[in-house]
């Protein structure tokens, strides 16, 4: 069994949206996925608890219980445990990262979200975990051209220390429509743009965790880490040291 921790150090980034949609996408692709809601806000539970299959696939938990839950899920035959992590305190975020095979930091293309992504990356790298960053709630391209804010976010995150997923999730009303019905975007419109993005993101994450046709996860800038003149992540994002 593999474990994915979906992280954000600030509210509003869409961490729960990503976690829930990835879990339901996995199940749609015949991966036996379960979700652990370790966020005290219990947003994932609010969305999913009315589903017929919620029992056995959705768990309310806390950071201190994640290791035991992971062991129980593995014994039950699950293929994938997705953790909707708390935003704080840092110790709880770290506990979630420790039990994960891969940490997925969620960030919108905004100054404060990028700053929070740097803090998430710091925890992931300090613990020696594999990780990546996904940009969420991005404005869609116009006439095939990415909005400047999205381009700048991708450029800034090149220096954050972890790779950025090639698929960004766009700001679309269907996410809220789906949540209001306790469903995923794939269940609302399986042929829509949002569904395609979620499927692509899940396959990228799943292949990364299972080692399918991928080299070990490392930042494209790994070979620059020995160079003293490389800007720090906070400097690259225009943040104070």
Give the residues covered by each predicted segment.
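Structural beta-sheet core signal
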Residues: 35, 83, 105, 133-135
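Anionic-ligand binding region
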Residues: 112-137, 141-159
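P-loop NTP-binding site
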Residues: 216-241
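Inter-motif core of Ras-like GTPase G domains
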Residues: 89-111
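Beta-strand-loop-alpha "switch" segments that mediate conformational coupling across diverse proteins
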Residues: 139, 153-184
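P-loop/Walker-type NTP enzyme "switch/lid" segment
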Residues: 3-13, 20-94, 145-151, 179-180, ...
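Inter-lobe coupling/hinge region of RecA-like P-loop helicase motors
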Residues: 176-195, 199
